[in-house]
Design a protein with these regions (language model features):
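A structural "domain/chain start" motif
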Residues: 2, 6, 19-61, 165-171
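Short secondary-structure boundary/capping segments
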Residues: 29-30, 64, 113, 119
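Short acidic low-complexity segments
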Residues: 60-71
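C-terminal/domain-edge helix-coil "capping" segments
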Residues: 135-171
Length: 171
């Protein structure tokens, strides 16, 4: 049996789908890196997660030796720190700002050609703090840093996708 309410929902769904298609929306697929092979030096949690994501989400081959790679992703810095944002009326810390900063660049294997000049990504998260919940707040801090690391990996991959060979000499 035909009902006005059911057909209006179907019409609304069709209009919504047409609007989404018209604006260019599409689900995120594979990240197509502009390199056939990539070397990522280092042995830390950020590098491990970055390698996992590149291997899973692109056709780019990860290599162990920089000489075998079309591109080398080098890190210039990786810093995590915690800054006091506010104090309570009793003079105790009540809020922190967590910061995660990573600097990196992408060159060819010889370092002669720069695909992505030295870049820096800074992520921050605010965290309320209480002396009564020290263990819980330590766990929350670790969780926030892991979350920032995941975000960092995604942002680095987005920048790698946008990288183009350039003829800028390395400083």
């Amino acid at each position: 049996m035909w009902s006005f309410e059911g057909s209006s929902r179907a019409a609304f769904a069709c209009v919504l789908a047409a609007l989404l298609a018209a604006c260019g929306f599409h689900l995120r697929g594979q990240a197509e890196l502009p390199f056939e092979s990539l070397h990522i030096p280092g042995n830390n949690p950020l590098v491990a997660e970055l390698k996992r994501n590149v291997a899973a989400a692109s056709r780019t081959r990860l290599v162990d030796k920089p000489g075998e790679a079309q591109a080398v992703l080098g890190f210039t810095e990786e810093l995590r720190d915690k800054i006091i944002l506010s104090f309570s009326s009793a003079g105790r810390v009540s809020e922190y700002k967590l910061r995660y900063r990573v600097g990196f660049r992408v060159t060819d294997a010889k370092g002669a050609q720069v695909y992505l000049p030295t870049s820096e990504i800074l992520l921050t998260r605010d965290m309320a703090y209480s002396d009564a919940q020290v263990l819980a707040k330590e766990a929350e801090e670790a969780l926030l840093f892991r979350d920032m690391q995941r975000d960092m990996v995604q942002q680095i991959i987005r920048r790698l996708v946008a990288a183009k060979p350039a003829t800028v000499p390395i400083e």
